[in-house]
């Protein structure tokens, strides 16, 4: 018989740097999960992705055990890294803060493909380009 799920927790944590401090501690503590066990496992699995924020979905079971699924980094984080900027524009329609090429958009779309609900790479590319535009990043050929 399958274990009974008692909670789903969604967090965005820096890769390889999860600590029992907030937001991890309180979120997992409510469900009675061993916080240190989660932190060790998460840090081990994300050690090779340093510098990124990795979303994670933690499933907590009735016997206080847990499993988690790592997602791909948010599109905005990948776009900022590709454009070499700290943050997006406050007024994206007026002042542009950076540029990325179609090739970079394609790379980001391929990275994000498992988590996007796009049928094709072209659809994924247009989603990523839209995210870039809303951040004040221009997409150039």
From Swiss-Prot:
- On the tree of life, the source organism's domain of life is Bacteria
Is Ribosomal protein a UniProt keyword of this protein? yes
Q: Which GO terms describe its biological process?
A: translation
Q: Which GO terms describe its molecular function?
A: large ribosomal subunit rRNA binding; structural constituent of ribosome
SMART domains cross-referenced by the UniProt entry: RL11
> What Pfam families does the database record attribute to this sequence?
Ribosomal_L11, Ribosomal_L11_N
Which InterPro entries does this entry report, sorted A to Z?
Ribosomal_uL11, Ribosomal_uL11_bac-typ, Ribosomal_uL11_C, Ribosomal_uL11_C_sf, Ribosomal_uL11_N, Ribosomal_uL11_N_sf
Q: How is it modified after translation?
A: One or more lysine residues are methylated.
Q: Which UniProt keywords apply?
A: Methylation, Ribonucleoprotein, Ribosomal protein, RNA-binding, rRNA-binding
The entry's cellular-component GO terms read:
cytosolic large ribosomal subunit
What assembly does the database describe for this protein? Part of the ribosomal stalk of the 50S ribosomal subunit. Interacts with L10 and the large rRNA to form the base of the stalk. L10 forms an elongated spine to which L12 dimers bind in a sequential fashion forming a multimeric L10(L12)X complex.
> What family does the Swiss-Prot or TrEMBL record give for this protein?
Belongs to the universal ribosomal protein uL11 family.
Q: What does it do? A: Forms part of the ribosomal stalk which helps the ribosome interact with GTP-bound translation factors.
Q: Check the record and name the PANTHER family matching this protein.
A: 60S RIBOSOMAL PROTEIN L12, LARGE RIBOSOMAL SUBUNIT PROTEIN UL11M
Descriptive protein name: Large ribosomal subunit protein uL11
Native organism is Clostridium acetobutylicum (strain ATCC 824 / DSM 792 / JCM 1419 / IAM 19013 / LMG 5710 / NBRC 13948 / NRRL B-527 / VKM B-1787 / 2291 / W)
Taxonomic path: Bacteria, Bacillati, Bacillota, Clostridia, Eubacteriales
Q: Which gene encodes it?
A: rplK
């Amino acid at each position: 018989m399958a274990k009974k799920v008692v909670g789903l927790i969604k967090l965005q944590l820096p890769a390889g740097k999860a600590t029992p401090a907030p937001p991890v501690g309180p979120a997992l503590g409510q469900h009675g999960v061993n916080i240190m066990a989660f932190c060790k496992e998460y840090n081990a699995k994300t050690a090779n992705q340093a510098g990124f924020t990795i979303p994670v979905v933690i499933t907590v079971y009735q016997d206080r055990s847990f499993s988690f699924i790592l997602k791909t980094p948010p599109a905005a984080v990948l776009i900022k890294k590709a454009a070499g900027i700290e943050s997006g524009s406050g007024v994206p329609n007026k002042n542009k803060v950076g540029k990325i090429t179609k090739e970079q958009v394609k790379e980001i779309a391929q990275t994000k493909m498992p988590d996007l609900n796009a049928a094709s790479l072209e659809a994924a590319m247009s989603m990523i380009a839209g995210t870039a535009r809303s951040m004040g990043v221009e997409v150039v050929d």
